């Protein structure tokens, strides 16, 4: 058979272009996804970099996020002790159908991370992956909980370091949702949407 011939003729192997795919998001628009970018913190003395540390070590997620994310998805606190970053911590099919990214706060001294968009222990409602997210409980218009289920990205600290602001969308799975400016008070966890009364 043809398969046997290829296996016997080693010279033909370099002509093969097959790939083993074990995750849904193996390609993003125009390129294959083979790695996940991570932010690193390091010491720079003007000539060399030392002590590089991956602030998302061991996590299979990306920051900045595909396809348009860049350095605007990260922010240093004014006192240099924390980094706010954007990430969608989902994998496989859940990643592929969701726009639910969050803002995370990494503490450089104790190396802990907390989600500013959702409370500790939050578990998103299960979704029916073959149906639109629009009318599922994850996007319920009757919910009084503010879990920032859509895109949350591009964090910035206030000059006094007391607040983090970011662009926020309300609904999961809806890339054209209206962007709101969310201002988060670090001391209390209170969120304020300062653009709610604006016309869009």
Placement of each model-derived feature along the sequence:
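Short amphipathic alpha-helices and their capping/turn segments at secondary-structure boundaries
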Residues: 1, 70-74
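Generic structural hydrophobic/aromatic packing signal, biased to beta-strands
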Residues: 55, 74, 80-83, 116
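Predominantly five- to eight-bladed beta-propeller fold
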Residues: 1-58, 86-89, 93-104, 137, ...
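Multi-bladed beta-propeller domains
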Residues: 43-70, 96-99, 104-153, 168-177, ...
């Amino acid at each position: 058979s043809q398969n046997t011939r290829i296996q016997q003729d080693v010279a033909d192997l370099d002509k093969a272009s097959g790939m083993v795919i074990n995750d849904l998001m193996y390609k993003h628009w125009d390129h294959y996804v083979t790695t996940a970018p991570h932010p690193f913190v390091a010491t720079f003395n003007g000539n060399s970099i030392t002590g590089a540390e991956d602030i998302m070590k061991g996590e299979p997620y990306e920051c900045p996020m595909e396809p348009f994310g860049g350095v605007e998805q990260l922010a240093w606190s004014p006192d240099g002790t924390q980094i706010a970053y954007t990430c969608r911590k989902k994998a496989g099919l859940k990643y592929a159908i969701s726009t639910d990214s969050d803002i995370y706060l990494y503490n450089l001294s104790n190396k802990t991370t907390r989600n500013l968009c959702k409370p500790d222990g939050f578990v998103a409602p299960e979704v029916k992956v073959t149906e639109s997210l629009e009318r599922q409980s994850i996007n319920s218009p009757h919910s009084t909980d503010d879990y920032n289920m859509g895109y949350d990205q591009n964090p910035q600290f206030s000059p006094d370091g007391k607040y983090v602001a970011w662009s926020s969308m309300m609904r999961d799975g809806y890339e054209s949702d209206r962007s709101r400016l969310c201002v988060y008070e670090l001391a209390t966890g209170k969120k304020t949407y300062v653009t709610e009364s604006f016309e869009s």
